[in-house]
Every structure is written in C-alpha cells, then in structure tokens.
Amino acid sequence: KDIEANHLELIDLVVVNLYPFKQTIEKKSKWEDAIENIDIGGPSMIRSAAKNHSDVSVLVDPSQYQEFLEERKKGSFNESYKAKLAFEAFQHTADYDAAISKWISKEKNLLSSKYIEAYPLIKTLRYGENPHQKAFWYGLSNIGWNSAEQLQGKELSYNNLLDLESALTTVLEFGYEEKDILTTNKFASVILKHNNPCGASISNSASQAFLNALECDSVSAFGGIVAFNSNVDSATAKNLKDIFLECVVAPSFDEEALEILKIKKNLRILRLSKDKFPKKNQTSTKSIMGGILVQETDDSEDKTENWISVTKKNPSNMMNLDLNFAWKICKHVKSNAIV
C-alpha cells in the first residue's frame, strides 16, 4: 500500500560490493582499521535480496556482471538462474563472515568452538584418486599451487597435486631458491611416488642431487614427481629427460633446460617462486568418520647441537650431518620409516 500510495518502483536488482575486509587484513593493518572495514549494511542487503530471490536478483561480485547482462538480453530471468544468484550470495556472505571470525580468532588467540574455512573453487578436476571418483580443487587465489606457473603438460590431476605437495614440503627442509642455499651447499632433489619419497639427496649441484636421489630407488622413480629447491639448469634437464616422470617443480628453469625438458610433451613442468608460499603456522586437517582432525603443521627445525647422545660412543660431526639429513627426510615418510 505504501508503495502504491507513494508511486514507488519495486526493487528487482540489488548490487553490493562489500567493504574490502580481506584486502585490509592482508596488509597487516591495525586492529582499528580492520574493524572499520567490516561491512554491516552490505551483508544485510545481500541476505534480504537473496531470501526474496524469486522477485529480486542479487549480484555480489563484478565477475557476475557479464553473465547477468547476457541473461537480461534473453528477457525475464528464470527461477533456476535467480536461485543460482541467491546461492552465490549466501556463499559470499558466509565467506565474508568466516574471514572475520578467523581473523579475530588469530589476533586474540581464541580457540574457535566451530571450525570454519571458506575456500573458493579453483577448478573441477578430471577425477579423484581413481577414475570413478569426482574431485574438486578449492583454494586461495594467488597463493601456493594455485599460483604456480605450469610451463608445459596436461592439467594437474588430484594425485599430481597430492604428490607435488609432499615433494615440495620435503625439499623445503633444505631451503628454497638460490639465495637460501648458496652458502649452505644444500642443493636438494626429492623424487616422490605414491605420496612417499623414494629418493632424496643434497649435493653441490642440482644435477648431482638428482642423480644421487635417483640411485636410491631408480625403479620406483619411474612415473614419479621430482622437486628441486634451486634453479634447474641444462645439465640437470639432460638427466631428467632420460626417465619417465609425471611432474617437475622448481623455483626457476634456465631457457636451455626448458627446451630440453619440453621434448617430453607430457611432462608437467611447474615453476613456483618462494614469494607464493602461504605464511607459516598453517594447520592441516584429516577427515574421519563424523568429523575432522585439525593440527598445526610440523614446522619445527631441529639443530644437531641440541641433540643429546645417550650412548657411550658419540657420533662424529659427519655422522651428525647424515643423521640430520635422515631425520628431515623421515619426517615426510608416511609409513614406518627407515632412512
């Protein structure tokens, strides 16, 4: 009645861009600045419009605009499209609230009574661990594997991503990129198969590190994943091309090395720089029946000078170096480990 009495038009479209809370906290802003960038009215308008989606269309992200305009040209919006917009709207506000909750929990060291994580869909994978299983990749934009440059090869599979993660976290035990390792002589290479290291080595060059790792178990290395913590040069590439591999990941590749590796058309070549790594103090999760288990990732760094010998014979410095290497690798072996 009020609408009719005042000759008002009905609202049939609501477009809201929320305050940039995530962008604000990424800049490590002050508490007050972050609080100021928590939107109040925006989420209320979005939720109201989404609830009434049969009569109102709601847009929450500029990426939706083009599709909306194309649908508009067709005439009236069908119910399924409006429901899709409502679904995306509620997901958007849920993600926004999750980011706020997680940030406050971290800033004030508060244990959350509910485990809330919101990751956008990166892509639908071809299949999961087996061909009959569906699989999806969710994650943060421009961080981790989502930011890796794939220089060649087919799209990454579910198993590829699991193996790449294990290979990279193992090789990271010895530094990453040239500036980290030139002074320590720890050029490292790890060969991984079925989510377990089957060979690992540190040496005075990436090429020799790979050859040493290959000697650990050249049979299991067939069809495996190789990770380096340093630049891959032509000498290393020549050794890599002699064996069938699924993926190679490194912080950088020489142009000549890429030319050699690209002869193997199906080899997935990935370049991932250190500045794309997530911040430390991340958590890892495991699904169990009826829930999940959450723990801090194991980022501890053991130093040999802190070790205590409990035998009459003390290990030599060389033995300690070997034991330290074995200890680092053992940490990433999934079954009972003998390294």
Task: Go through each PLM region and give its residues.
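Active-site loop-to-helix "anion-binding N-cap" substructures in soluble metabolic enzymes
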Residues: 1-108, 176, 196, 204, ...
